[in-house]
Every structure is written in structure tokens, then in C-alpha cells.
């Protein structure tokens, strides 16, 4: 049993940090400088070493079809590894009660053949087409306090880690008046397969409904209590 604690020697495991948040998962690829959320892309036939951490309370990382479960504990670091041999999507779930939205703290492991995985990594490092639309301006005005969309920029990885800590401190120490909180990195959100930590498939209709009234999807989400666009109830998207 002990011999399986670490990936096989000379196997060149992919390094990933899985950070638990109430109630979503952040996935960091430190060697590639990539930060994303709720969808863990991995190559097939290659070990993946996962460093498990938590920003707030105890969570538990669990992908039933692929690996066992292990806790993420604030102030501590746990490690596990997994290997997926067949391409496909594998459902994951927080397996430790962590608050009101625990049952909706889902994620997805997306296993791709190595060439496709490498293509995904390259796409995450590629800037999107610059958008000067009103929607982009609204995102910068209202959403960028909590969400980042620039993981492709040089130095963005270190910046994102610092910003997440600062956002958390702002909210934790001033929950009544804070205007920001830790939130998923949304770089290249459009290529994701799901939204709201696995509550709905990624479609235009679901995305609009999620932005308009997050609590209808996921009770307890802090987005609606913090972001100014929700003051007084659901966002009035028709105004925009």
C-alpha cells in the first residue's frame, strides 16, 4: 500500500494544485502557469500528482471512477495522485460536509489524449480576441473585482494567487461591507462544459440564467450577496 502513495519513479507526473473553496474548486497548474476552476484537464496514461489545499474549511476531493478521496484542510497540505487511462469526463464531488452548498460543490475531470491535452494548455495561454463590446466593459466594471480572465498574461499566475488571498481576506474580515470575495478564474470560460460548479451544462441560456439570479442555481453563493449588480435582488440584465 505504501508503494502506491507516490506516482511510479521516472513517470513525469503532471503537477496540479486543487484548492477547495466554499463551494467550488480551483485548479492550478504551476509548471504551466495556468489557473482555472471546476474542470480539471488531465492527459491520459500519465500520472497526475495533486496537491490538496483549502482556503476556508475542510473539503474532500473525490473522483469515484478514478481515485479515492482525500481531505483538503486549511493550513495543511495533502497529496494524492491519479491516472486516467481512457479519455472521457469523470464526475467529482466534495465528500466532506462544508456548508449550505456542499452537495453542489461538484467538478469534472476531463481526460484527453496527450496531444489534445497539450492543445488545451496552449489555448489557455492564448489571448482571446479583444472585445470592445458593452458586455466586456460591464464585466470589467462589475465582475473583475472577484473574477480574473487573463491567465494567459505573463506573471498572471503569481498575481492570481495573491489576488485570491486578498479577496478572501477582504470578505472574511468584513463580511457586511466587502465588495469582493474569492471567485473562480474565468479565463476562456466559453470552452468549459459546465457552469456553477457542475450545476448546469454550459449553454448561452444557462449562462444568462446563472448570471441573472445565481441563488436559483446554487443556494449560498456569495456572488449575489457581494456584487453591486445584485443589490435589491436578481440582476436586471435587460438594463444592459
Model-derived features with residue positions:
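"…together with the soluble PPM/PP2C metallo-phosphatase catalytic core" -> "…together
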Residues: 186
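Non-transmembrane, membrane-proximal soluble domains of secreted or membrane proteins
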Residues: 1-144, 148-181, 198-212, 218-240
Amino acid at each position: 500500500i505504501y508503494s502506491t502513495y507516490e506516482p511510479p519513479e521516472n513517470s513525469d507526473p503532471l503537477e496540479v494544485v486543487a484548492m477547495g473553496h466554499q463551494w467550488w474548486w480551483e485548479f492550478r497548474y504551476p509548471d504551466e502557469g495556468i489557473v482555472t476552476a471546476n474542470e480539471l484537464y488531465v492527459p491520459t496514461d500519465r500520472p497526475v500528482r495533486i496537491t490538496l489545499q483549502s482556503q476556508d474549511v475542510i473539503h474532500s476531493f473525490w473522483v469515484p471512477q478514478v481515485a479515492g478521496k482525500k481531505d483538503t484542510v486549511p493550513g495543511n497540505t495533502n497529496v494524492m495522485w491519479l491516472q486516467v487511462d481512457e479519455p472521457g469526463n469523470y464526475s467529482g464531488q466534495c465528500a466532506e460536509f462544508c456548508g449550505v452548498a456542499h452537495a453542489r460543490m461538484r467538478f469534472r475531470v476531463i481526460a484527453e489524449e496527450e496531444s489534445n491535452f497539450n492543445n488545451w494548455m496552449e489555448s489557455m495561454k492564448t489571448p482571446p480576441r479583444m472585445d470592445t463590446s458593452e458586455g466586456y466593459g460591464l464585466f470589467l466594471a462589475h465582475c473583475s473585482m472577484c473574477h480574473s480572465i487573463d491567465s494567459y498574461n505573463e506573471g498572471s499566475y503569481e498575481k492570481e494567487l495573491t489576488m485570491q488571498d486578498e479577496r478572501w481576506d477582504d470578505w472574511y474580515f468584513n463580511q457586511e461591507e466587502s465588495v469582493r470575495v474569492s471567485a473562480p478564474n474565468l479565463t476562456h470560460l466559453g470552452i468549459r462544459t459546465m457552469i456553477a460548479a457542475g450545476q448546469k451544462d454550459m449553454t448561452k441560456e444557462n449562462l444568462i440564467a446563472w448570471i441573472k439570479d445565481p441563488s436559483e442555481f446554487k443556494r449560498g453563493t456569495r456572488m449575489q450577496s457581494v456584487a453591486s449588480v445584485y443589490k435589491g435582488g436578481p440582476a436586471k440584465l435587460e438594463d444592459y
